[in-house]
Amino acid sequence: MPIITSLITLSNTTATEIVGGDNMPHQVTLHNTTKSSNEYVHIGPADMTLANSIHLDPGQTIQITLRPGDVLYGMSDPNGLEVGILDIQNND
């Protein structure tokens, strides 16, 4: 099982791909690395905006399962926040 870690800086105007698609389901852990109040990492599909997405509170960590072909995008409010990612992929 490949394990991929990354730290991605996000924009508040453009959705950034944070987890690419795979041909197998995979477990993804996301962490909003900021500790300051009212600074949120938003996640969603490619056409996401800050108004139509779910957010991670400062310091929050979540785990989700992505299905084959799913791609996850992120944005931040304010601009320039970082999201930590741990992607545990399954072998074919």
Language model features: what each stretch is:
Residues 31-52:
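Short, surface-exposed beta-strand/strand-loop-strand elements in extracellular ectodomains
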Residues 26-28, 66-80:
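Noncatalytic modules at the cell exterior or secretory-pathway interfaces
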Residues 91-92:
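Short acidic DE-rich linear segments
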Residues 57-69:
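Beta-sandwich interaction modules
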Residues 39-43, 78-88:
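Edge beta-strands of jelly-roll/beta-sandwich modules across compartments, strongly enriched
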Residues 20-35:
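A short, compositionally biased N-terminal segment around positions ~18-40 that is enriched
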Residues 2-23:
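Surface-exposed ligand/attachment interfaces on beta-rich extracellular proteins
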